[in-house]
Amino acid sequence: MTGKKRSASSSRWLQEHFSDKYVQQAQKKGLRSRAWFKLDEIQQSDKLFKPGMTVVDLGAAPGGWSQYVVTQIGGKGRIIACDLLPMDPIVGVDFLQGDFRDELVMKALLERVGDSKVQVVMSDMAPNMSGTPAVDIPRAMYLVELALDMCRDVLAPGGSFVVKVFQGEGFDEYLREIRSLFTKVKVRKPDSSRARSREVYIVATGRK
């Protein structure tokens, strides 16, 4: 791809981004990202979060999902969050910066969870996209498999899992895997998710 094509594509993305009504609303409300609205839509339909819950947030930065969940679980709730990128502090959120794919980071995250009964694991993780689906989709699927492994390790019986997945090779198999672990599984495409994006959200409840 030439520099001119990249520049044109980047300009289109920026124009679309800043004219996006959810981006504008997020800025007006002082929210960290438009992802806040995606989780709000999911909460309205699936009622995942309740006061006092313990929640694990994977791929947390810049903090849109954690910021939303704090409003739902209240002061007695707890969020353990992790991301490769830094994240400004949020009251009620225990943040660990590190690469979730690293075993030492995974171990540190599990230590922070400790004996807590985790009611929700949520993952908005995504790899750095190259624009080539044959490269991007396997990278993304690896991350969502790791998120599901976290569910196996820490999620309490009856707990819930919400994960961003990019449709493509491996999606159907992953969905079957989740259905074997949860009693109810839905695939959501929030209105606040860009229409041309491959992303969908799998919402799984009732950990077996």
From Swiss-Prot:
The keyword Magnesium does not apply. It is found in: Cytoplasm. InterPro entries: RNA_methyltr_RlmE, RNA_MeTrfase_FtsJ_dom, rRNA-MeTfrase_E, rRNA_MeTrfase_gammaproteobac, SAM-dependent_MTases_sf. One of its GO terms (molecular function) is rRNA (uridine-2'-O-)-methyltransferase activity. Keywords: Cytoplasm, Methyltransferase, rRNA processing, S-adenosyl-L-methionine, Transferase. Its main location: cytoplasm. GO terms for cellular component: cytoplasm. The keyword S-adenosyl-L-methionine applies. Transmembrane segments: none annotated. S-adenosyl-L-methionine binds at residues 63, 65, 83, 99, 124. SUPFAM superfamilies: S-adenosyl-L-methionine-dependent methyltransferases (SSF53335). Its EC number is 2.1.1.166. It holds the Pfam family FtsJ. Belongs to the class I-like SAM-binding methyltransferase superfamily. RNA methyltransferase RlmE family. Specifically methylates the uridine in position 2552 of 23S rRNA at the 2'-O position of the ribose in the fully assembled 50S ribosomal subunit. NCBIfam families: PRK11188.1, rrmJ. This is Ribosomal RNA large subunit methyltransferase E. It comes from Salmonella typhi. The gene is rlmE.
